[in-house]
UniProtKB/Swiss-Prot annotation:
This protein's name: Ranatuerin-7
Coiled coil ranges: none
Family to which the UniProt record says this protein belongs: Belongs to the frog skin active peptide (FSAP) family. Temporin subfamily.
Compartments in which it is found: Secreted
Function: Antibacterial activity against Gram-positive bacterium S.aureus (MIC=200 uM). Shows no detectable hemolytic activity towards human erythrocytes.
Keywords assigned: Amphibian defense peptide, Antibiotic, Antimicrobial, Secreted
BP-aspect Gene Ontology terms: defense response to bacterium
Tissues with expression: Expressed by the skin glands.
Keyword Secreted assigned: yes
Length: 13
């Protein structure tokens, strides 16, 4: 779950 959020954040940034 956390990894998914980090991945989404990285993609957004």
């Amino acid at each position: 779950f956390l990894s998914a959020i980090a991945s989404m954040l990285g993609k957004f940034l």
